[in-house]
């Protein structure tokens, strides 16, 4: 049986798929959950607090569920899959007043995923700490840049295919990055 907080979160994500963040009300959420307003306010201060909590929870789940990657670009796969799966919701979050918090959590997830890859990969053993930090920063920025561009373009191109093309271009043109 789902806990009340999870039910509220699920309703919030459903509503994000349907309408912009700024149009979602506490009333919409409690009606969707068949709860009363007091129950909502017992768990969350307001909708921005709910948004922050749910994005952080989403980020933590991606980090916990994805530890093994074959290449720096395959690190992006879990994020790409989530963005495609919840395209409208992420577009609505990105275009909302919670945009800064959303980008902060995206950065957190991307950095963690790339750091996990760097720790696992034998390609980086001989690199200096400074080189490892530089490469980690590069791949994190590349990941976030691609995701933000996709959101800015309203998701009008095949994100998964684009990431695969980028990976092949980097892989074939510069083995020194690996």
What are these regions (language model features)?
Residues 1-19, 23-26, 32-178:
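Alpha-helical bundle regulatory/interaction domains
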């Amino acid at each position: 049986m789902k806990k009340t907080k999870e039910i509220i979160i699920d309703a919030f994500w459903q509503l994000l798929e349907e309408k912009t963040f700024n149009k979602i009300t506490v009333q919409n959420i409690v009606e969707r959950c068949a709860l009363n307003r007091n129950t909502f306010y017992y768990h969350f201060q307001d909708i921005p607090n709910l948004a922050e909590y749910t994005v952080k929870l989403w980020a933590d789940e991606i980090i916990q569920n994805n530890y093994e990657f074959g290449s720096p670009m395959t690190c992006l796969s879990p994020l790409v899959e989530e963005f495609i799966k919840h395209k409208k919701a992420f577009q609505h979050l990105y275009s909302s007043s919670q945009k800064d918090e959303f980008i902060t959590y995206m950065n957190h997830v991307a950095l963690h995923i790339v750091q996990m890859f760097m720790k696992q990969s034998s390609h980086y053993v001989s690199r200096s700490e400074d080189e490892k930090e530089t490469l980690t920063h590069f791949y994190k920025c590349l990941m976030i840049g691609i995701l933000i561009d996709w959101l800015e373009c309203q998701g009008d191109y095949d994100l998964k295919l684009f990431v695969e093309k980028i990976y092949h271009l980097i892989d074939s043109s510069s083995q020194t990055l690996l």
